[in-house]
Amino acid sequence: ITGMVFPVLMFPACIIYALAELLIPELARCNAAGSSHRVIYLVRRSLKVTLLYSLIFSGGMFLLSEPLCTALYNEAQIAKHLRQYSCLIPMLYCDAITDAMIKGLGQQKMSVRYNILTNILDVAFLYLLLPRYGIGGYFFSFLVTHIINFGLSYRRLLKITKLQIPWHIPIFSLACGAFAIWVSSHTQRYPVQVILYLVILFSGLTAL
């Protein structure tokens, strides 16, 4: 999984990490200048763009997992793992940008604490679950620790920026993506699946 699934899963995130590198000094500058409105604008905009970007690739990898794994590794059995982890892309990408933003706002120590906590939990979960449940235990550990890390970072970001984001926006966006995947997966041709997914996704998100 680490050598075959994660490279495909995280390859599109290179754009997110590039954005994160640009955000850190810009947020630090705005924070030092007391430009709270600019900080809130950047945070809100970055989260929206990252969520949309991640939903596009999450659905695309879910639907194209089999041809992708066959083309890259000549191994279709890896596709089931790529489908499983592709559902976590929105959280993983949003976590990356959130972590960068709290660092830019002077919360490096908190970021380190969160990472240390989740790493300790990860080791504990793997020690307890991996021998008994195998790949399933690894997925559970990965899911729980990343949810905790993202939850703590996101909560910290909202606290220091005093930004209020209605919960219905991310929930509706994720539900729209899940519905688009469900509808698209009922077609057999891969290009049609992706086009249908994007049409349904963007149609739903324009309602926000």
What are the roles of these predicted feature ranges?
Residues 18, 59, 135, 190-191:
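Residue-level detector of secondary-structure boundary/capping sites
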Residues 167-208:
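Transmembrane alpha-helical segments of multi-pass transport proteins
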Residues 63-64, 71-72, 128-133, 155-160, ...:
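Helix-loop junctions at the membrane-solvent interface of multi-pass transporters
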Residues 34-37, 159-174:
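Interhelical loop/hinge segments that connect adjacent transmembrane helices in multipass membrane
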Residues 7, 43, 47, 51, ...:
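Hydrophobic, aromatic-rich alpha-helical transmembrane segments
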Residues 16, 35, 130, 189-194:
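Intrinsic-disorder/low-complexity, polar/charged segments
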Residues 17-20, 80-106, 110-130, 135-157, ...:
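Short runs within selected transmembrane alpha-helices of multi-pass transporters and secretion channels
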Residues 2-94, 98-107, 113:
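Specific pore-lining/lateral-gate transmembrane helices of multi-pass inner-membrane transport
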